[in-house]
Each structure stands twice: as C-alpha cells, then as structure tokens.
Amino acid sequence: MGVYYMRRRIQVEAEKPQFCVTTGITFAQADAWFGNTVQDLKLDLIYPRDNTRKYPCVVWICGGAWIQMDRSAHLAYLSVLAHQGFVVASVEYRTSNEAKFPAPLQDVKAGIRYLRAHADRFNIDPDRIGVMGESAGGYL
C-alpha cells in the first residue's frame, strides 16, 4: 500500500532542453598539404533553440596524435553540455600531415574568432567562451 500511495503522490515532470545541431559550418579556408591546396575548415555546433538569452560557449578540440582528427566523433557526449545550457562548438584544425605548427593553433583561433563574430546568430555570449580538448586538442 505504501509504494502505491507514493506513486500516486509523487509526479516527476522534467522537460528536456531543446537544442539544434548544425554540422559542417565553414569558418575559414586554409592552405593544406603544405601549400599545395586549399581546405575548408569546418565546425559543428550544438546550441539551444531558446533565443531569448545568450549562452556560454565551450569550444571542443578533439585529439588525434596530431595526425588525424574527427570533429564530429564526440557530438553525442558533447550534447550533455548543451543540455546543461552551453553552446558547444567542435572545431576542425589542420593535422601534421597537412601543415606545420603553428597552423593548428591558428585554425582553432580562427574558429573562436568566427564564433565571436557570429555570436548573435548562435545565441553565444561572446564574453563567456571557454576551451577544452583531449590529447593533441588539449595542447591546442
């Protein structure tokens, strides 16, 4: 009788935050293959649908031992941050197979500049942008 009574009395109402996922946004073009070609640098973005306020942004930089990278690999994990009220941007950078250092660092900085320049479009508070990463991305 006690469990039945509690089930009737306790009602849990939770609303999932709604967010958008946009992939493949070109934020810059850069020389690739050591100056022999041009490459579009892209980012993936997870941002709340609610456009009534600005949100802090977390820029995610994936790892890959400097020789490979997949900016979309962790979007499922990063969506947890979006549920907590962050805009999350996963940025692409050139690897050591494509360009010499400091090219990867310049690419990440270009991504952050793009996010600041388009802060209104994605509901980003340009004064609250943080960076995190793993492996090579953590160094950048």
What are these regions (language model features)?
Residues Q68-S72, E98-A99:
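Short N-terminal helix/helix-N-cap motif within the alpha/beta-hydrolase-1
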